[in-house]
Swiss-Prot record:
InterPro entries: Cytidine_deaminase-like, FdhD. GO terms for cellular component: cytoplasm. This is Sulfur carrier protein FdhD. It is found in: Cytoplasm. Gene3D superfamilies: 3.10.20.10, Cytidine Deaminase, domain 2. Belongs to the FdhD family. The active site is at 121 (cysteine persulfide intermediate). Keywords: Cytoplasm, Molybdenum cofactor biosynthesis. The gene is fdhD. GO terms for biological process: Mo-molybdopterin cofactor biosynthetic process.
Length: 277
């Protein structure tokens, strides 16, 4: 490999989650070039020494991912149930080693499932079909949002995708205040993982992140709705469409679900009473 190519590779590795590889363009199959590609690695969540789940994810913000996954899957009730966390390399990927309280670990062992995930898959490894759409405590109606504030947020969603800007290969999830300001966001090759990262961070931000809604760059699947509801999110905006099961779960748990969010337009699937225009 040429020295200039090697230097470019060294530079790009400063951006977590991106790697440069050789590839060929359709108009020039004789001469390879370097381009940025998003990294996807197996990430195992290990609770008190026992591996619970393996997900394919971007290798960044994994502490937030582990916290958000633990909350959105009902493994913990609050961040206080986790006593410690370390991200360590393993032979085939990364491990997030999590120390749970004894009470929460006993609960986890009682319902433990073996799950080997595809990219951001939230269903793989569910033992029974009845486990899909598990009951979620109905949400209160404490949040409101003016749809006129949505356009500005949509324009800035890409700001939270530095890997996506280079590779075109990530989803984003961001927290949107009632003013339309995006105060924080995360990206990942898996849309569910991006959401878990955001939910994990939100759980640590306190009151400043309690008022508002989630905005995601992807479609809204039932897992996205269920994870949001499990973490007390009342309004979920998605850039793409929603599935029928997502709508059913949102209706049942009192979540306001909005899809096809583009400048000047939005489709409200459930509970429009939280919204104004």
């Amino acid at each position: 490999m040429k020295k200039t190519q090697q230097k470019e590779i060294e530079n790009v590795t400063n951006i977590t989650g991106v790697r440069q590889i050789e590839l060929w363009r359709h108009d020039d199959l004789q001469h390879p070039r370097l381009d940025e590609v998003a990294e996807e690695v197996p990430v195992a969540l290990v609770y008190n020494g026992i591996s619970h789940v393996v997900m394919m994810a971007s290798p960044k913000d994994l502490e937030y991912f582990a916290l958000g996954f633990s909350l959105s899957e009902g493994i913990i009730e609050s961040p206080r149930d986790i006593f410690g966390m370390d991200v360590v390399p393993s032979c085939n990927g990364l491990e997030v080693q999590i120390e749970l309280s004894s009470r929460r670990f006993m609960g986890l062992k009682e319902r433990r499932r073996a799950l080997a995930g595809r990219t951001g898959c939230g269903v793989c490894g569910v033992e029974q079909l009845n486990d899909i759409g598990k009951p979620v405590q109905p949400l209160p109606f404490t949040q409101t949002f003016d749809l006129n504030k949505l356009d500005d947020a949509l324009r800035h969603l890409n700001d939270f995708q530095p890997v996506g800007q280079l590779t075109g290969c990530t989803h984003a999830a961001a927290w949107m205040l009632p003013s339309g300001e995006l105060v924080g966001g995360h990206e990942d090759v898996g849309r569910h993982v991006a959401l878990d990262k955001l939910l994990g961070r939100r759980s640590q931000e306190g009151e400043s992140w309690q008022q508002g809604a989630v905005l995601v760059s992807s479609r809204a699947s039932y897992e996205m709705v269920q994870k949001s509801a499990m973490c007390g999110v009342e309004i979920l905006f998605a850039v793409s469409a929603a599935t029928t099961l997502a709508v059913e779960v949102a209706e049942r748990c009192n979540l306001t679900l909005v899809g096809f969010c583009k400048p000047g337009r939005a489709t409200v699937y459930t509970h429009p009473q939280r919204l104004s225009n």
